[in-house]
Amino acid sequence: MKIGVIGAGKIGKTIATYLASEGFEVKIADIENRDIPNFVELDASDKTALTEFVKSVDIIVSATLFHLNKGIADVCAEVGTAYFDLTEDTEVSEHIRKLDTKTFMMPQSGLAPGAVNIIASDLIRKFDTVNEVKMRVGALPKYPSNAMAYYLTWST
């Protein structure tokens, strides 16, 4: 199975490295040329180039800037390539929900929402009744380096 990861920042590289270690054939794409294995230079806002990349794989994992996800999802739906993203952006998720496609589309599959929802669901199943569940996700570093004392992730 061939998996394309769009976005070669910290998260995208980590996803690609993990998938490759599990035996998947992985291509990783970004607009900035990176010296990493199986790298493809790609401007994800260029529909022609994006379509060519999407057609070359079975699954796309979008780990790029959230505002590019609508276009990436549209191309995946048109081409028939399964799509995952890590966005928390509800506008992107609503756009994907409205796509007329039989292609597997899975927005919001990152940490929160995503993994935290799976954890909550698993915990809920262990009880007879549940009145309320509150899950929180944060990134509090051991050695804060900014005024917010919070770990800045993604494109910060």
Regions found by a protein language model. Name each.
Residues T103-T156:
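Rossmann-like dinucleotide-binding core of oxidoreductases
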Residues F24-P37:
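NAD(P)-binding Rossmann-fold cofactor-contacting core
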Residues G12-K13:
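N-terminal Rossmann-fold NAD(P) dinucleotide-binding loop
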Residues I59-V75, T90-E91:
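Beta-loop-alpha module in the N-terminal Rossmann-like domain of NAD(P)-dependent dehydrogenases
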Residues A44-S56:
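Conserved Rossmann-fold cofactor-binding substructure of NAD(P)-dependent oxidoreductases
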Residues A8-G9:
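Glycine-rich Rossmann-fold phosphate-binding loop(s) that bind the pyrophosphate
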Residues L86-M106:
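Rossmann-fold NAD(P)-binding glycine/threonine-rich loop
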